[in-house]
């Protein structure tokens, strides 16, 4: 009996070291060698300073910027999660109605029937950095007007920031809001010169 306990303890310790230390360090090393940008969180830098991750959405409330999806967790990556409200839950409809009204208020001239679901509903993680191209195009008029840019210029920024389907098959075309807003910032700087 004592021999079995010793063997069990040794087995446990060996696997704790292998799976708790060796494996994570080896995988981290491989990730840093093969995918250094992604391994470090896909951090986007401007003038050498981090401004965000292309993997985590940010809250843009200023009308000068394209807004992203609503977040059930206020874009807090430490408490990722969606609302988990069922379609039959009155709170879901209250939240949806509030988001629709807010979007319509910020984007006059947009019809309720034109609003895509992604811009008024939070994602499952509450941290989605992407919106649909349609959601971006619906904001072009407001963003162009507030920034004093021609609508066509802002529309082209959206066009340039559309990411296609993964491997041409999976998912839907999407726009990373942070990248789009950084492109917009560059365009604003160009027009001020």
Curated annotation (Swiss-Prot):
It holds the Pfam family KdpC. The keyword Iron does not apply. Part of the high-affinity ATP-driven potassium transport (or Kdp) system, which catalyzes the hydrolysis of ATP coupled with the electrogenic transport of potassium into the cytoplasm. This subunit acts as a catalytic chaperone that increases the ATP-binding affinity of the ATP-hydrolyzing subunit KdpB by the formation of a transient KdpB/KdpC/ATP ternary complex. It comes from the Bacteria. The keyword Membrane applies. It is a single-pass membrane protein. InterPro entries: KdpC. Belongs to the KdpC family. It is found in: Cell membrane. The gene is kdpC. The system is composed of three essential subunits: KdpA, KdpB and KdpC. Keywords: ATP-binding, Cell membrane, Ion transport, Membrane, Nucleotide-binding, Potassium, Potassium transport, Transmembrane, Transmembrane helix, Transport. Signal peptide: none annotated. This is Potassium-transporting ATPase KdpC subunit. The chain crosses the membrane at residues 11-31. One of its GO terms (molecular function) is P-type potassium transmembrane transporter activity. GO terms for cellular component: plasma membrane.
